[in-house]
Amino acid sequence: MIQVLLVTICLAAFPYQGSSIILESGNVNDYEIVYPRKVTPVPRGAVQPKYEDAMQYELKVNGEPVVLHLEKNKGLFSEDYSETHYSPDGREITTYPLVEDHCYYHGRIENDADSTASISTCNGLKGHFKLQGEMYLIEPLELSDSEAHAVYKYENVEKEDEAPKMCGVTQNWESYEPTKKAFQLNLTPEQQGFPQRYVELVIIADHRMYMKYKRDSNKITQWVHQMVNTINEIYRPLNIQFALVGLEIWSNQDLITVTSVSDDTLISFANWRETVLLRRKSHDNAQLLTAIVFDEGIIGRAPLAGMCDPNRSVGTVQDHSKINFRVAIIMAHEIGHNLGMGHDDNSCTCGGYSCIMLPRLSKQPSKLFSDCSKKDYLTFLKVKNPQCILNKPLRTDTVSTPVSGNELLEA
């Protein structure tokens, strides 16, 4: 039986109108201070895990009480999840950390059917939730009062860069559009049922990422875990579960040539993934997370309909924002291209301010797929019938032993 924890957040809700605070997400105006307080622990004598399977939080937002229900995202990691980094002399070091009792949750707001939440509880509450159609961020404050958190609307974060940010979808690797048009589905609402699919994901953080985060692999790891948790939340309506099977940090040097020309970097990464990564770690899709600034305002690139192809089931994503879910949205967008989704045009709708497959990142990023994207995805399943995303992640997915010189550490 799942023990449910009730935590009351006593809100000395102090909105600082017109003043600014510097948070991890950037400069924020108009925020509230909240103080979490645990009031209903698990029954006396019960074994309490570090992170409960289900939790509830009470808090006030804009002066109104809300209840946040959270459930652990148990499918976030595969059973053989591994982390790889490199020693100063270039040796590959792979560990298999125990991640069953992790701290990443999905959730909803009570009495708000349209609400969503993606929260980590690793060090306080950190993440985002949607309430009454608006996106809010929450994060702990670095104050002497360790329980203080800030809650604020996404729109109140000062924008880091007003320059347009675009996706550079790659279509010239294989002509998919003619086949797609021949099989284009005209779906009634009743037909838009999505079959269960599973994507085993590997994320590579390049050397610039390692330097950007001041050589702190733990920070990169938490950043990536939070991103994949959000990607899972985004794809839940399409019935796709993402399991992170591996995280690799190029801590010594890049293993490919990473340049500001996004197409060159994508091709180089795709070739490395096919010839090196696939031989030592079975997976369905690999994404390169880089701190380089790509030319022409591009922040992501991926081949169209490449999922399950050894050379095309890849993407590159620029770590362009201090706000985790903005980067997660770009990675979800690029994976959408891998799953057959083209860019939305003006005829596409999703019931939101913007849709996730727009060619440019909007000022109010959306986590919603349009009707066009859903049709594209179902058409991709029908035309390509990708086999690699049929199986659930298993512990036996490691297909070969590491080459001589690697260190294998069981944590």
Curated annotation (Swiss-Prot):
Signal peptide interval: 1-20
Subcellular localization, as worded in the UniProt entry: Secreted
Entry annotation: catalytic residues: E334
Entry keyword Cytoplasm: no
Cofactor(s), names only, from the UniProt record: Zn(2+)
GO cellular component: extracellular region; plasma membrane
This enzyme's EC code(s): 3.4.24.-
Main localization (coarse): secreted
Propeptide regions on this chain: 21-189
Keyword Signal: yes
UniProt record similarity statement: Belongs to the venom metalloproteinase (M12B) family. P-I subfamily.
Task of the protein: This venom zinc protease has fibrinolytic activity. The recombinant enzyme cleaves both alpha- (FGA) and beta-chains (FGB) of fibrinogen, but not the gamma-chain. The recombinant protein does not produce hemorrhage in mice and does not have effect on ADP- or collagen-stimulated platelet aggregation.
Oligomer status and interactors: Monomer.
Protein name: Snake venom metalloproteinase VMP1
